[in-house]
């Protein structure tokens, strides 16, 4: 505690749903320990969403792109490189305003790690904590690129302590050794996170110690690392946070189709759930192959196809397959993964989705697209052994017959029993990690002690 008041943690996420959700859940965990938590959101996102953050206070600030948010910037790099003085002054003003209202900051949590934010923390007398929302394995690759130990584009296999043998197609950012550029700003942004890391007081990771123990034990980073995941609502894990059944922040409106009632009518472990997240955009050819693969499995399915992607579906697909399949534009993924009827999760292997699949014990079929996804899919199949990764052919997309093979392998094949057994084991470990005395629970308590029982105030 500071000056007899509650310790106050400020959270500054990257303004995207996949980054806000985990840091918001972390904030709820901190609040459950009687800490004040404030998430700093942009005006654009606050105006675009109906948030229900629960015990976390929301404070809005202008990022200079109020009408359109990050997508209104010329590029991702331009957004994150916007003038330091402008961004820093606004955050210092917010910190001073909170301080004047009796809510002095204790810790500033950042994602990613911009230098201006580190300077804000220092000027305001706050601790700074770098919050990483991707797995340690992926950031290990970025760290080696930053240090010059891995040269891009990568053409040879990569062998590093603590990591499985990696081919260029397994590496993060984009496949084929960073060769197929989906977002030209992404690699520099990810790599340059490590530029300012030595200025942070601590690192928080949305991971589980048991998932990446070798890497975490062998970390060469110049600061303490705390694994605080999985950052999934408590209802699905330890149930220690009251009424915490949803993230409380959603840029998309869930489909009104009664998909849970539909699931209730299905047998246990019989339904394929397909979702490629909030950002991935499949080509029309890939969409067609997924559709043909689903038909070929002859199994019930729910497929999330965002409104912007519906035109890519084959003509009459929804109507012709209505007897055994649903197409919805958005849904509550946790509800689907937790349902007893769900037997397989076909996923792009974004880290949040991967962690949800692990935490809820659902076997996975990985169809990675870009960023960290290929490496996450590698771990799903070869390290944690909770699913399989679909192979690509020719035009770099997954054919329908390969999709069918993977689904059948996970749900009915020779390895399906072992995959389900592994999924159940990791599910238990995930729940144990955030339960009283678990690895993540201990890390969260250590984080609180270091941030709040010190004369220096902190910023996450």
From Swiss-Prot:
One GO MF term attached to the UniProt entry: quercetin 7-O-glucosyltransferase activity
Residue positions binding an anthocyanidin: 19
GO BP term, example: carotenoid biosynthetic process
EC code(s) of this entry: 2.4.1.271
Transmembrane segments: none
Entry-linked InterPro entries: UDP_glucos_trans, UDP_glycos_trans_CS
Domain of life: Eukaryota
Top enzyme class: transferase
Tissues with expression: Mainly expressed in fully developed stigmas.
Catalysed reactions, semicolon-separated: crocetin + UDP-alpha-D-glucose = beta-D-glucosyl crocetin + UDP; beta-D-glucosyl crocetin + UDP-alpha-D-glucose = bis(beta-D-glucosyl) crocetin + UDP; beta-D-gentiobiosyl crocetin + UDP-alpha-D-glucose = beta-D-gentiobiosyl beta-D-glucosyl crocetin + UDP
Gene3D superfamilies assigned: Glycogen Phosphorylase B (3.40.50.2000)
Keywords: Carotenoid biosynthesis, Glycosyltransferase, Transferase
Binding site for UDP-alpha-D-glucose: 133, 333, 348, 351-353, 356, 372-373
Record-linked CDD domains: GT1_Gtf-like (cd03784)
Active-site residues per Swiss-Prot or TrEMBL entry: 19 (proton acceptor)
Pfam families: UDPGT
Protein's job: Crocetin glucosyltransferase involved in the synthesis of crocin, one of the apocarotenoids responsible for the color and bitter taste of saffron.
Family listed: Belongs to the UDP-glycosyltransferase family.
The protein's name: Crocetin glucosyltransferase 2
Species of provenance: Crocus sativus (Saffron)
């Amino acid at each position: 505690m500071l000056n007899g008041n509650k310790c106050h943690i400020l959270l500054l996420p990257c303004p995207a749903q996949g980054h806000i959700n985990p840091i918001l859940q972390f904030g709820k965990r901190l609040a459950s320990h009687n800490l004040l938590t404030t998430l700093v959101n942009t005006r654009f996102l606050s105006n675009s969403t109906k948030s229900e953050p629960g015990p976390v206070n929301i404070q809005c600030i202008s990022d200079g792109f109020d009408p359109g948010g990050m997508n209104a910037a010329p590029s991702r790099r331009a957004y994150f490189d916007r003038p330091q003085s402008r961004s820093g002054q606004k955050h210092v003003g917010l910190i001073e305003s909170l301080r004047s209202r009796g809510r002095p900051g204790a810790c500033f949590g950042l994602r990613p790690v911009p230098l201006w934010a580190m300077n804000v923390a220092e000027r305001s007398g706050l601790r700074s904590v770098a919050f990483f929302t991707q797995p340690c394995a992926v950031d290990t690759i970025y760290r080696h690129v930053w240090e010059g130990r891995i040269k891009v584009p990568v053409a040879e296999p990569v062998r590093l302590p603590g990591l499985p043998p990696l081919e260029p197609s397994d590496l993060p950012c984009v496949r084929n050794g960073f060769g197929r550029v989906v977002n030209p700003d992404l690699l520099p942004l990810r790599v340059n996170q490590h530029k300012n890391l030595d200025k942070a007081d601590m690192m928080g990771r949305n991971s589980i110690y048991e998932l990446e123990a070798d890497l975490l034990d062998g970390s060469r980073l110049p600061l303490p690392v705390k694994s605080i995941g999985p950052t999934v609502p408590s209802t699905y894990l330890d149930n220690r946070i009251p009424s915490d059944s949803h993230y409380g922040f959603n840029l998309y409106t869930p489909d009104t189709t009664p998909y849970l009632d539909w699931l209730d009518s299905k047998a246990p472990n019989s339904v394929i759930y397909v979702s490629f997240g909030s950002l991935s955009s499949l080509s029309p050819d890939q969409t067609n192959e997924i559709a043909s693969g689903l038909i070929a499995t002859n199994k019930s399915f729910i497929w999330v196809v965002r409104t912007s992607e519906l035109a890519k579906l084959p003509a009459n697909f929804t109507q012709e397959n209505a007897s055994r399949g649903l197409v919805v534009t958005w849904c509550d993924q946790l509800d689907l993964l937790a349902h007893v009827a769900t037997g397989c999760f076909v996923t792009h292997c974004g880290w949040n989705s991967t962690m949800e699949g692990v935490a809820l014990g659902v076997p996975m079929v990985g169809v990675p697209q870009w960023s960290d996804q290929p490496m996450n899919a590698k771990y799903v199949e070869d390290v944690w052994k909770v699913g399989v990764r679909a192979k690509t052919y020719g035009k770099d997309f997954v054919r329908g017959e390969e999709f069918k093979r993977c689904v059948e392998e996970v749900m009915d094949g020779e390895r399906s029993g072992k995959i389900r057994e592994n999924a159940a084991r990791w599910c238990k470990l995930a729940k144990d990690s955030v339960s009283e005395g678990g690895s993540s629970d201990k890390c969260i308590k250590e984080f609180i002690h270091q941030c709040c029982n010190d004369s220096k105030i902190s910023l996450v």
